[in-house]
């Protein structure tokens, strides 16, 4: 009896469970009663572009890690610099003073900072980008092109040498110092003529791209600048008595008639130019002529520097050749003396031998 009662109880329990399951399936469940989905954690991993290869990805990752490391060092060393400043480049170099201070140059958008350690003492140099007035490429001992000279508005000059990648650092400084413009191939300086941008917007680009004729300077000026008209040529002769050509009136008239009424000056330098106190010439024309002179003098100075460098190299080459020849001659003489000593020792009789 007990076994039958137990089996009936188990059957009733199974029927109740089946009834509950069917009821739960038939009963509609609203969307509000469904549990909310678990939000996935954000993905902080780096996503590289599809075009990059494995080696390039590794290189970018290493550069990012090193820049992050240098950024922490930068803010730890220079606490006055705002935390928003991000290091763009760190380069190993030496600051030239009484002796070379080996350290690192930290370049950020608004600051140029140098740090060196000498006998446990920290040496720091902080240069605001706004105060930079000139950046010039420098040669260490006039031979090694591995330096940069930075001049500030307080006339302080900082020379950084032993730069392994000087050109890349120079290009980065040119992008950072937006208030500077290239004055030559090897230097950056403050923009000139900042007070009159309207009067020089047309003149300066035209003067840069327009070549100067060596025979006459007045022909290279733009057409919209007034200068001496042909009718006032006789009046200009009084300003230039030394440049007056030895020609008669008939020869001048003949030359003018051959050229259709226009004056053609046979010798260079005799043409009409704008004197210092000429009412028809505007001051912009004078500035244009001065700017042309500066543009012509720059390549001459660079050529002279190159000739001077070549001469120094020749002198050093001759000295090196002389040292090599003298050392070889001394080695030859030493070997001859050794041979003579050996021959004398062989010729001497052995002591105690008869």
From Swiss-Prot:
Residues 31-40 have a biased composition (Basic and acidic residues). Coiled coil: none annotated. It holds the Pfam family GRAM. This is GRAM domain-containing protein 2A. One of its GO terms (biological process) is regulation of store-operated calcium entry. Residues 1-29 have a biased composition (Polar residues). It is found in: Endoplasmic reticulum membrane; Cell membrane. InterPro entries: GRAM, PH-like_dom_sf, RAMD2A. GRAM domain is required for specific location to endoplasmic reticulum-plasma membrane contact sites (EPCS). Mediates interaction to phosphatidylinositol lipids and binding to plasma membrane. It is a single-pass membrane protein; Peripheral membrane protein. The keyword Transmembrane applies. Residues 72-139 form the GRAM domain. Gene3D superfamilies: Pleckstrin-homology domain (PH domain)/Phosphotyrosine-binding domain (PTB). Participates in the organization of endoplasmic reticulum-plasma membrane contact sites (EPCS) with pleiotropic functions including STIM1 recruitment and calcium homeostasis. Constitutive tether that co-localize with ESYT2/3 tethers at endoplasmic reticulum-plasma membrane contact sites in a phosphatidylinositol lipid-dependent manner. Pre-marks the subset of phosphtidylinositol 4,5-biphosphate (PI(4,5)P2)-enriched EPCS destined for the store operated calcium entry pathway (SOCE).
